[in-house]
A protein has these predicted regions:
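Positively charged n-region of N-terminal signal peptides that target proteins for export
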Residues: 1-4
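Bacterial N-terminal signal peptides
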Residues: 7-15
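Secreted/extracellular ectodomain signature
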Residues: 20-132
C-alpha cells in the first residue's frame, strides 16, 4: 500500500512538472536581415513595405525579421525623427528586431536615451549582419 501510494505521488508530481513546462515555440522557418544605412524617407518607406510584404508572404511558416540601422540610417531610430515612429513601433511589436549600431551611436554621439525604446542596440552593424 505504501509503495503504491509513493508510486502514485511520484507519477502525479511528474505530471505536474510536465504540465508546467510549456513547449518551446517553434523557430521561424525563414529569416531575413535588412540593412538601413541611408537617411531618406523613400528608403525607409520601402523598407517598411518590404517588411510587411515578407511577413504576409511567410506568415504560415513564420519569419524572423531584423533590421540593422547604421551610418546615416540610424537617424530613423532617433526619437526626434517622428515621421516613422508609429510604423517602426508596430513592426517592433510584431516581433521585428530593430538594431541600432553602437559604433555609429558612439561616432555620432547618440545615447541610448536618444533612440526609440522599442529598438535594441547591437555592438556593430556590420558584425550583426554577418552573425545573422
Amino acid at each position: 500500500m505504501k509503495t503504491t501510494l509513493l508510486a502514485v505521488l511520484a507519477l502525479a508530481a511528474a505530471g505536474v512538472a510536465h504540465a508546467q513546462t510549456a513547449p518551446a515555440a517553434a523557430p521561424a522557418k525563414h529569416k531575413v536581415v535588412f540593412q538601413m544605412n541611408v537617411a531618406d524617407n523613400d528608403s525607409w518607406n520601402q523598407l517598411l513595405g518590404n517588411i510587411g510584404n515578407a511577413r504576409r508572404a511567410f506568415e504560415k511558416d513564420g519569419i524572423q525579421i531584423e533590421v540593422v540601422f547604421y551610418g546615416k540610417g540610424i537617424t530613423a531610430l532617433l526619437k526626434t525623427n517622428t515621421a516613422f515612429e508609429e510604423r517602426l513601433k508596430k513592426a517592433a511589436a510584431d516581433g521585428v528586431v530593430l538594431g541600432a549600431c553602437q559604433n555609429t551611436m558612439r561616432l555620432r554621439k547618440i545615447t541610448s536615451e536618444d533612440i526609440f525604446p522599442f529598438s535594441t542596440e547591437v555592438d556593430s552593424g556590420v558584425a550583426e549582419l554577418i552573425r545573422t
